[in-house]
């Protein structure tokens, strides 16, 4: 082979959305690079070296120095190899590719990740015929944590560990984001000063759509000041909003009245006014996994405290450990009533009585491990014949049903297994009566054998331990939580990262919901808009869209404190959902729902579209129009009771239609209003005669637009 038979061709790899990097604006360029080189246009070639700034960001070269660029410094033959020489940047991945004229395709020949800066070489075995080669550069994320090796090098982190920041158990991506947020300057690992980057308004609004019931102007300003990471730190240790207390605040002592309206009133008061928004959103998400429902269940529906007490269980553990939450749910009288393991008796074959299997089935299928064995990335495991592997069978259900026998009423009325109780007594946990608990061994999930001779409570402990130790629980529940906060179709890498935190929070603890929630919200796929292209994001729940609208404009009435006159019977019909009002234990929608059309053809899911029927879309639009125009008055209440949005700020902008729409875009759609929608709203606003009508028209059109309905 002569040197002339090897033709080098240089090509740079462009940054792709979703590549491993801290990229909060979704521009495809690392925020760290942008802060090192502030104000540069990615499309420009500032130093005139023939490479635009975006390409230099990928290569890690200096966009202000025309001599700093990716180039082949030399090519020589050594034995039977062609040796390429170039100057590398620490943490960047370099690949020599060869072109195949027969197929027209390039293939990787040799790859290395630069462990040091300066001269680099790669030796490529050379064929006898002429070859065309190219040198490509890309970012590399060896530990899969969402920060690339170049960024980790700047911070002094390691690309071999996702928890190398020295900040306890915090993931490196989250630590990197916190490092960059704020004002003033920070020092990189080599002592280089770098200006910090406080989050911009649009990023904060989008984040609050994911992590709260929606931002209002004050909350948005606060998060812009303390940073997304700073707000997360505040929220992970707040005082607990207890809905029973909220209900009692509105309704007097526990037995004063149990009218179900007060549950909804209490929920709304918490969602609209409480500061611990992250915990409340997690409680709402958990209520759609560990489902009980007032729909068609008089005991639950007719007593506001029964509903609130169950919700309190979810809130109490929402940032705690899932194993503890699962235990309290298993013992809750509300769940015992709903899934019929309250007064579930031991077997008596002589009369054909066997334990009820309802709760035993659903605690596996819906609350912990699902139907099919999963890999850590959520994909199904397959047997040797390529078939999905069930996690359990009917025998397992029958054995698990034996575990959940012997429960009777607890509290003051729980004097025996057969004692009855009124509705208020349902707020007390169930009590185990061993005389009605199934004796003997129980062969349950994961080949676990619960020994004979234990108490009922010991059997339950063993069963819950087995479920929470099962490898399925991490990817199964993590996916359900991701779907409630950030996206319907998480990539395998996203789900794998979150499931890894479920399996180990950094201290060896499994099921730490606080750590899992931070992993969900502070993942690069959550913090980077459209990280997974047009498969990113989710359709927002209609009920939460209503709450977000009311919060954005601080809807209140003249009462101090405000009251929330919400009729519980109207929203399921209008929106297809209301907290604790699912039509079945399977929630309002299935996590794998695939609407007909393009989504199904592409293998994508959209759970929320299962309740998007034509009549609900029309009724929901009419209701939102009524709320915007008149306020929320489902009881046709006196004017003093009606919740009215405060439109004073947008009304002050109404003389300038473009300024008005831009303000609402930043508040409601995080700057993502499409140009066509923006122009249509401006034209509609200009056609209105008064400031009031201009604002109402603009708000209505925006909240009904895809840009508000779909979170990207």
Can you name each region flagged by the protein language model?
Residues 196, 220, 224-227, 236, ...:
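Active-site substrate-binding loop specific to GH73 endo-beta-N-acetylglucosaminidase modules
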Residues 205-212, 290, 470-474, 478-507, ...:
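Flexible, low-complexity segments enriched for small/polar residues
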Residues 33, 37, 55-62, 67, ...:
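Sec/Tat-exported extracytoplasmic proteins
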Residues 1-7:
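Bacterial N-terminal signal peptides that target proteins for export
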Residues 8-17:
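Bacterial N-terminal signal peptides
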Residues 193-239:
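N-terminal mature-domain "stem" immediately C-terminal to a signal peptide or N-terminal signal-anchor/transmembrane
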Residues 19-193:
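Short, composition-biased motifs enriched in small/polar/acidic residues
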Residues 11, 33-34, 53, 96, ...:
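Residue-level detector of buried hydrophobic side-chain packing
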């Amino acid at each position: 082979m002569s040197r002339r038979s090897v033709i080098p061709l240089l090509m740079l790899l462009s940054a792709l959305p979703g590549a491993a990097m801290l990229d909060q604006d979704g521009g495809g360029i690392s925020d760290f690079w942008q802060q090192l080189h502030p104000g540069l246009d990615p499309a420009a070639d500032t130093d005139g070296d023939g490479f635009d700034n975006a390409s230099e960001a990928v290569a890690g070269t200096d966009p202000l120095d025309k001599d700093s660029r990716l180039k082949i410094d030399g090519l020589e033959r050594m034995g039977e190899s062609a040796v390429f020489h170039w100057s590398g940047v620490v943490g960047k991945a370099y690949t020599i590719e060869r072109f195949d004229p027969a197929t027209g395709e390039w293939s990787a020949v040799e790859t290395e990740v630069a462990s040091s800066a300066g001269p680099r070489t790669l030796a490529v075995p050379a064929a006898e015929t002429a070859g065309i080669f190219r040198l490509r550069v890309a970012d590399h994320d060896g530990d899969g944590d969402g920060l690339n090796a170049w960024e980790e090098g700047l911070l002094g982190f390691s690309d071999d560990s996702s928890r190398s920041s020295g900040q306890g158990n915090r993931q490196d991506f989250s630590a990197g984001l916190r490092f960059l947020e704020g004002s003033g300057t920070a020092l990189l690992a080599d002592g280089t000063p770098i200006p910090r980057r406080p989050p911009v308004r649009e990023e904060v609004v989008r984040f609050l759509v994911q992590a709260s019931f929606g931002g209002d102007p004050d909350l948005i300003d606060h998060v812009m000041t303390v940073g997304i990471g700073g707000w997360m730190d505040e929220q992970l240790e707040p005082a607990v909003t207890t809905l029973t207390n909220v209900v009692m605040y509105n309704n007097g002592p526990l037995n004063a009245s149990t009218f179900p309206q007060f549950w909804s009133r209490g929920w709304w008061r918490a969602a609209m006014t409480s500061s611990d928004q992250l915990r409340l959103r997690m409680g709402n998400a958990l209520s759609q996994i560990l489902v009980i429902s007032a729909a068609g269940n008089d005991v639950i529906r007719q007593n506001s405290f029964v509903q609130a007490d169950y919700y309190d269980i979810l809130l109490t553990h929402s940032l705690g450990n899932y194993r503890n939450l699962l235990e309290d749910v298993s013992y809750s009288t509300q769940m015992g009533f709903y899934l019929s393991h309250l007064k579930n008796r031991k077997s008596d074959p002589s009369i054909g009585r066997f334990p009820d299997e309802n709760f035993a089935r659903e605690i596996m299928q819906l609350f912990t491990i699902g139907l099919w064995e999963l890999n850590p990335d959520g994909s199904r495991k397959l047997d040797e014949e390529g078939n999905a592997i069930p996690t359990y069978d009917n025998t397992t259900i029958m054995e698990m049903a034996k575990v959940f026998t012997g429960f009777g009423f607890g509290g003051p009325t729980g004097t025996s297994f057969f004692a009855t109780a009124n509705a208020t007594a349902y707020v007390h946990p169930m009590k185990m009566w061993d005389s009605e608990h199934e004796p003997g061994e129980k062969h349950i999930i994961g080949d676990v054998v619960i020994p004979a001779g234990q108490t009922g409570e010991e059997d339950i402990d063993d069963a819950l331990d087995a479920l929470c130790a099962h490898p399925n629980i991490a990817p199964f529940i993590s996916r359900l939580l991701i779907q409630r906060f950030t996206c319907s179709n998480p990539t395998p890498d996203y789900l794998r990262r979150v499931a890894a935190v479920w399996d180990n929070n950094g201290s060896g603890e499994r099921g730490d919901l606080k750590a899992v929630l931070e992993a969900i919200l502070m993942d690069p796929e959550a913090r980077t808009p459209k990280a997974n292209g047009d498969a990113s994001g989710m359709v927002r729940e209609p009920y939460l869209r209503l709450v977000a609208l009311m919060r954005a404009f601080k809807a209140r009435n003249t009462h101090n404190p405000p009251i929330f006159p919400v009729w519980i019977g109207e929203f399921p019909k209008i929106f297809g959902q209301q907290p604790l009002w699912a039509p079945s234990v399977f929630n309002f929608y299935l996590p794998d729902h695939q609407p007909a059309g393009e989504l199904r053809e592409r293998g994508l899911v959209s759970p929320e579209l299962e309740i998007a029927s034509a009549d609900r879309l029309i009724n929901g639009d009419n209701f939102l129009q009524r709320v915007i125009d008149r306020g929320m008055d489902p009881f046709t209440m006196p004017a003093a009771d009606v919740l009215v949005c405060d439109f004073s700020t947008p009304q002050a902008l109404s003389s300038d239609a473009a300024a008005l729409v831009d303000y609402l875009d930043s508040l409601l759609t995080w700057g993502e209003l499409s140009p066509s929608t923006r122009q249509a709203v401006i034209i509609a606003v200009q056609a209105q005669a008064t400031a009031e009508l201009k604002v109402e028209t603009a708000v209505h059109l925006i909240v009904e637009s895809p840009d508000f309905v779909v979170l990207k």
